[in-house]
């Protein structure tokens, strides 16, 4: 009976250890976690000593390493901006996708809507303007708060 209990305990322990992963953030910080899944630009995980599910933006993570296989998976590449011309690299996120990123300020802009301009073309131009302002300030991520004519506003995010 003791042998069966010992074997059962070891098999459960080995399966838990096999699920252990190491997350490496873009700022170099490493976290030991139990990886669950990736969905909607978020990485879901639990801490080894807890069962509470947590999430972090996939853009804050550089690599995910599975400890049992020493397999390394690249989650995202670090975005570096060199000026306003790199506005295409700026990513627009939803507020829920910013976990693990650091808020770096608010940008505002003015953009008048011309007569006959469609709503979609106005929204595209507004997004472009906000991305250019964020790239100029070196922030690779934005969350658009307001895209109304005469009141464009976004929150900028960078790596922690």
Predicted features along the sequence, with ranges:
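Compositionally biased alpha-helical segments
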Residues: 19-141, 145-149, 155-160
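Bacterial Sec-dependent N-terminal signal peptides
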Residues: 1-22
């Amino acid at each position: 009976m003791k042998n069966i209990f010992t074997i059962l305990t070891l098999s459960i322990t080995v399966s838990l250890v096999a699920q252990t992963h190491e997350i490496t953030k873009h700022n170099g910080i490493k976290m030991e976690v139990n990886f669950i899944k990736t969905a909607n630009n978020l990485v879901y995980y639990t801490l080894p000593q807890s069962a509470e599910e947590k999430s972090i933006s996939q853009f804050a993570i550089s690599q995910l390493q599975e400890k049992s296989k020493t397999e390394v998976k690249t989650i995202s590449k670090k975005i570096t901006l060199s000026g306003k011309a790199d506005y295409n690299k700026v990513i627009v996120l939803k507020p829920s996708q910013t976990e693990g990123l650091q808020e770096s300020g608010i940008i505002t802009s003015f953009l008048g809507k011309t007569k006959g301009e469609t709503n979609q073309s106005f929204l595209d131009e507004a997004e472009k303007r906000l991305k250019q302002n964020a790239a100029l300030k070196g922030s690779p991520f934005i969350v658009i708060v307001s895209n109304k004519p005469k009141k464009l506003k976004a929150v900028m995010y960078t790596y922690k």
